[in-house]
Amino acid sequence: MKKWLIPVGIIVALIAIIAFWSIGIKNTALQHSQAVNKEWGNVNTAYQRRNDLIGNLVNTVKGAADFEKSTLTAVIEARAKATSVTIDPSNVTPEQLAQFNQAQSGVSSSLSRLLVSVEQYPTLKANENFLKLQDELASTENQILTARTRFNEQVQV
């Protein structure tokens, strides 16, 4: 047997091992990236559901003739601001996340003020549609928490 075949065989084997290892790392990175994108999509879906419910809730509350217009306006403006902020999970920066979180916090705080001021309107509290929307909103807040937790867990992998 020729002596030069052994070193060539070893080199070819090492190249093959490195190639397979590189492909494995690339595939794992792609799977991780896709999982992060999927979880971010779930977060956005939960926030979109909340925004849709807020629109329905505001329309129901508008039916109360003497309801505080400033509270409704604050909710509508916060919702508009939150829906204008979008993030691409593959190119996310800490500044974008901070802006997104600030917009969502604005929605949460104005929505909390709305729900507190509703306590002063017994007819509105007795409105079946309003109560249903309030329950759905609470459920959606739980979905948001779950989606954000799963996203954070996936990013840490």
What are these regions (language model features)?
Residues M1-V157:
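A helix-centric hydrophobic-segment signal that preferentially recognizes long
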